[in-house]
Amino acid sequence: LLTRQLLMPGLDEKQMNSLIGSAAGTRAVRKDNVNQLASALNQFMMYGDESIYRKELTDKELVYMNISELTGNINDAIKYAAEIHYSGTLPFETVYQILSHSLPLVAGEKPTTSPTIKKMKEYSENTVYFIPNNDAQQSQIYFYIPMGDYQKELRVKNSAFNQYMSGGFSGLIMNEIREKNSMAYTAYGMVTSEGLPGSKVYFSGYVGTQNDKAIDAVKLYMSLLSNMPERPERIENIKSYLRQAALSNQ
């Protein structure tokens, strides 16, 4: 069944037109959607021209897409080397025989660059991106701080930091910004990366707050990063969380 779908995809003109119309309709309304605008700005802040919104098909390309073009794209895609992951009780040899005889695996396939690491935007100074919107009832503020190259040996420390800073309502950010000072309805912050050699590590944060509290919320958020309060009573709980996470991931 999978082979037939790959080699002879049953593409339906009516269904495709319906999907294109749905996508075009979504694009038309997202320009006035505050959450979508905030997401697009965050993407541009982190990736610049590599943003998913900048890389997508233009409206014209979307409208003029046809089945023959889409079929050609599918046929081109299966010419590249593929990785197949199997989880189950069958022995390796059995799975290998089934897949090699059932899937359209081609000889001399094109080399793949997967997984592709998206280049992140670099900054030489503090930069603020701003979208004025009179219809926005709340301020959505994103933070992005590049932290250099990914290092596997720092994963545990980064996880501990994330629990300390953003571990639910007991996390430093939510506790200080929302619980103690009532400056936001939600807030978070964490060190993250794609987890691949050659990828970048960065701090990603967010505050959602009332418009009249935005400036004070940003000041408090940045003070937590530059002058981080110490909560030694939380360390044992964080260690316990990390141990349980390590056991569950085995």
Feature names for model-found ranges:
Residues 1-113, 181, 186-250:
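Charge-rich, well-structured scaffold segments of protease-associated domains
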